[in-house]
Design a protein with these regions (language model features):
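Alpha-helical transmembrane segments
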Residues: 15-23
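Membrane-interface helix caps and helix-loop-helix hairpins in membrane proteins
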Residues: 96-103
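Short, strongly hydrophobic alpha-helical membrane anchors
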Residues: 1-13
Length: 155
C-alpha cells in the first residue's frame, strides 16, 4: 500500500462521513419541521406551513409565543415583542462582530428562543409556560427535545 492508496482511503472516509452528516442533518431538519408544524397547528397559529422554511420557522415560533403582544415579560423583566420575533436577524448581525460576536449570538439565541419553546409547550401540554421554562431553554440548545415534545401535538 503506497501513499496514494492511503490518501484515497482518507479522502473516501471523509466523503462518507460528510455524506452521513448531510443525511443525518436532513433527517433531523425534516423531523424538527414536522414537530414544529404540529406544535404551531396545536397552538392555533394561522400559518403553520412556516415551519418548513429555514428563516420563517424562527419567526413563526416567536410570533406564536408572543401572540401579538408589544411587551413580553421573562421572569419579571419586560422585553419588547419585536426582540423575540426578529431575534434570529439580531443573532446573524451579532455574528459579524469579530472576537466574541458568536458568543453573544448564542446567548441571545438561547435567551430568546427558550421562552418561545416554553410558551408553545405550555399551550400544547395545557400547563403554565413558567413550568416549562427549563425545557424551553434546553430546547433552544438541543434540537431533539422539540421533536420528542411536539411529535404528538394536536393529535
Amino acid at each position: 500500500m503506497d501513499g496514494w492508496d492511503v490518501l484515497a482511503a482518507i479522502i473516501w472516509s471523509i466523503l462518507v462521513f460528510a455524506a452521513l452528516c448531510a443525511v443525518g442533518s436532513i433527517v433531523v431538519y425534516v423531523l424538527h419541521s414536522i414537530s414544529l408544524y404540529r406544535g404551531l397547528s396545536a397552538c392555533g397559529y394561522v400559518d403553520p406551513w412556516m415551519a418548513w422554511a429555514p428563516v420563517l420557522r424562527q419567526y413563526a415560533l416567536a410570533d406564536c409565543a408572543v401572540h401579538g403582544m408589544d411587551v413580553v415579560c421573562v421572569g419579571r423583566t419586560p422585553f419588547p415583542g419585536w426582540l423575540f420575533r426578529f431575534y434570529w436577524a439580531i443573532c446573524w448581525a451579532l455574528m459579524l462582530i469579530p472576537y466574541g460576536g458568536w458568543i453573544l449570538s448564542i446567548a441571545l439565541h438561547v435567551f430568546a428562543e427558550g421562552p418561545c419553546w416554553a410558551a408553545m409547550y405550555g399551550v400544547v401540554d395545557g400547563r403554565d409556560s413558567k413550568d416549562e421554562m427549563l425545557v424551553g431553554y434546553l430546547s433552544a440548545i438541543v434540537p431533539i427535545i422539540p421533536i420528542v415534545k411536539l411529535w404528538n401535538a394536536g393529535k
